[in-house]
């Protein structure tokens, strides 16, 4: 019996008209081998347990053999890239292989990245390399561990097929799993090409599949947009609170269901720098860390324009006006949790602002600062102060923080226990990802395996992996990453 016979399929996207996609077969790579298999996610999706030895799964997920349940397609969409509309986008190196029903009953896309040329590849070769594949695999699972909405990564495979970027590299494959691959750019494409019947059909399907609570609303499309605004606001707030810089927030990289999507030149903050630009192609800093909330609104405005045939202008504007207060509300709530403050008090905003000023002016390590605060049940206030160059300013802030904590009903021990559940000890620092890539390119997945342990539960101590909580070496600070993959 085939392994696929034990899995339920729901290939609903390919039931849409052909103008939404192009059927196409993956182009096989040479001598494909497993690099990683995500056992936890595989179990959630209903795959049988195995130790990366299934030849059938390797052959089918790599695209070498097509099971009868698969119907691989390249999706068509458009999008605004660095603020300019580009109509010529689509899945240029990835294919939606199939949609499976997880144990939870939710439908998940299985998407193969690096599958070869498609009609939307433009000048590209349709391939991915080990470098970018490892980064997405690790980061999507790191985000899941931080409880940030995200696509997931099921598997990685390597090959002997040469791929040429700045130098020769080796072709690799990533199997991504997500509840949806529908992007803001799907609606933009249909709107700008005046395919309004199909545009409405897509909106109907998005509501049916992802926002069924909107079906009974008097204005279902407006209700859908409200949901998208809210989910995007929460996602961006989670990015900011956790120090995540996406790097390339084009509208074709924005998920319609508010999941972090398309990991490329991302970074997690080491030293706190609100102006961090992690994408070396972002010459103007459009997607700098501190610009992400503004760009979230810009992208939603672009989506709103493309939804204008379905939603009244007043309803679109009303939803957009809610984005900033929603995002700020989510962010304030997250910062209170990170600081162990369960109640709201006047002056909290100033406490946050002065904290960020202190960290920015003194290049304080962002995750280390919050994790140290979380351990004040066993550490001294001086341990927090010692993280900061300007000790006098640090002491002033710590004194103000401890005075604010006195307004809480919880004990220090209770407060710190809760803080350790939201302030990770382990994050995917870029230098750790690079070390894992270097080993993976030599056929060694041990660093990937170790990182997957701590990233799955980044709040635990993991004493055997203490070295993965180390601050970056000089070469690993403020790394700028290329979009090339």
Curated annotation (Swiss-Prot):
Pfam family name, one: SelO
Q: Which UniProt keywords apply?
A: ATP-binding, Magnesium, Manganese, Metal-binding, Nucleotide-binding, Nucleotidyltransferase, Transferase
Entry annotation: catalytic residues = 252
Q: Where does Mg(2+) bind?
A: 253, 262
Cofactor(s) needed, names only, are: Mg(2+); Mn(2+)
Annotated GO MF terms: AMPylase activity; ATP binding; magnesium ion binding
Reply yes or no: does the keyword Nucleotidyltransferase apply.
yes
Q: What is its EC number?
A: 2.7.7.-, 2.7.7.108
* Residues that, per the record, bind ATP: 90, 92-93, 113, 125-126, 176, 183, 262
The keyword Manganese appears for this protein = yes
* Catalysis: reaction(s): L-seryl-[protein] + ATP = 3-O-(5'-adenylyl)-L-seryl-[protein] + diphosphate; L-threonyl-[protein] + ATP = 3-O-(5'-adenylyl)-L-threonyl-[protein] + diphosphate; L-tyrosyl-[protein] + ATP = O-(5'-adenylyl)-L-tyrosyl-[protein] + diphosphate; L-histidyl-[protein] + UTP = N(tele)-(5'-uridylyl)-L-histidyl-[protein] + diphosphate
| The organism's place on the tree of life at top rank | Bacteria
Q: What family is it from?
A: Belongs to the SELO family.
Q: What does the UniProt function comment say about this protein? A: Nucleotidyltransferase involved in the post-translational modification of proteins. It can catalyze the addition of adenosine monophosphate (AMP) or uridine monophosphate (UMP) to a protein, resulting in modifications known as AMPylation and UMPylation.
Q: Which PANTHER family match?
A: PROTEIN ADENYLYLTRANSFERASE SELO, MITOCHONDRIAL (PTHR32057:SF14)
Q: What NCBIfam families does UniProt report for this protein, alphabetically?
A: PRK00029.1
What is the name listed in the Swiss-Prot or TrEMBL entry for this protein?
Answer: Protein nucleotidyltransferase YdiU
Provenance organism: Vibrio atlanticus (strain LGP32)
Gene transcribed to yield this protein: ydiU
């Amino acid at each position: 019996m085939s392994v696929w016979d034990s899995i339920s399929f729901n290939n609903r996207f390919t039931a849409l008209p052909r103008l939404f996609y192009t059927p196409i077969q993956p182009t096989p790579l040479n001598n494909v081998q497993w690099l990683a298999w995500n056992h936890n996610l595989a179990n959630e999706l209903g795959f049988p347990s195995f130790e990366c030895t299934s030849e059938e799964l390797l052959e089918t997920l790599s695209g070498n053999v097509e099971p009868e349940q698969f119907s691989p397609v390249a999706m068509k969409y458009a999008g605004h890239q660095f603020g300019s509309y580009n109509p010529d986008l689509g899945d240029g190196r990835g294919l939606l292989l199939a949609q499976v029903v997880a144990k939870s009953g939710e439908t998940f896309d299985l998407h193969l990245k690096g599958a070869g040329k498609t009609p939307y590849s433009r000048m590209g070769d349709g391939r991915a390399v080990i470098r970018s594949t490892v980064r997405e695999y690790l980061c999507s699972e790191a985000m899941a561990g931080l409880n940030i909405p995200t696509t997931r990564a099921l598997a990685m495979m390597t090959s002997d097929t040469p791929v040429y970027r700045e130098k020769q590299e080796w072709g690799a494959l990533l199997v991504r799993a997500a509840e949806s691959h529908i992007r803001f750019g799907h609606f933009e494409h249909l709107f700008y090409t005046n395919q309004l019947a199909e545009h409405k059909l897509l909106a109907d399907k998005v509501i049916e599949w992802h926002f069924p609570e909107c079906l009974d609303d008097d204005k279902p499309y407006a209700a859908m947009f409200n949901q998208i605004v809210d989910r995007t606001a929460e996602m961006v707030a989670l990015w900011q609170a956790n120090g995540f810089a996406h790097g390339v927030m084009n509208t074709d990289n924005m998920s319609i269901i508010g999941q972090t999507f398309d990991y490329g030149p991302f970074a997690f903050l080491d030293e706190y720098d609100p102006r961090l630009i992690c994408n070396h192609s972002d010459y103007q800093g459009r997607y700098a860390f501190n610009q992400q909330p503004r760009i979230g609104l810009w992208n939603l405005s672009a989506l709103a324009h493309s939804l204008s045939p379905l939603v009244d202008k007043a309803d679109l504007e009303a939803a957009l006006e809610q984005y900033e207060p929603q995002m700020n509300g989510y962010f304030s709530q997250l910062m209170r949790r990170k600081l162990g403050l369960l109640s709201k008090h006047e002056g909290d905003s100033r406490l946050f602002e002065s904290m960020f000023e202190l960290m920015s002016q003194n290049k304080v390590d962002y995750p280390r600062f919050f994790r140290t605060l979380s351990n004040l049940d066993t550490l001294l206030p001086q341990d927090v102060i010692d993280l900061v160059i300007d000790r006098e300013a640090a002491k002033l802030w710590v004194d103000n923080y401890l005075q604010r904590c006195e307004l809480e009903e919880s004990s220090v021990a209770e407060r710190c226990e809760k803080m350790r559940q939201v302030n990770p000890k382990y994050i995917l620092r870029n230098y750790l990802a690079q070390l894992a890539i270097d080993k993976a390119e030599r056929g060694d997945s041990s660093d990937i395996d170790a990182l997957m342990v701590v990233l799955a539960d980044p709040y635990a101590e993991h004493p055997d992996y203490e070295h993965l909580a180390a601050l970056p070496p000089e070469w690993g600070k403020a790394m700028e990453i290329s979009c090339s993959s």
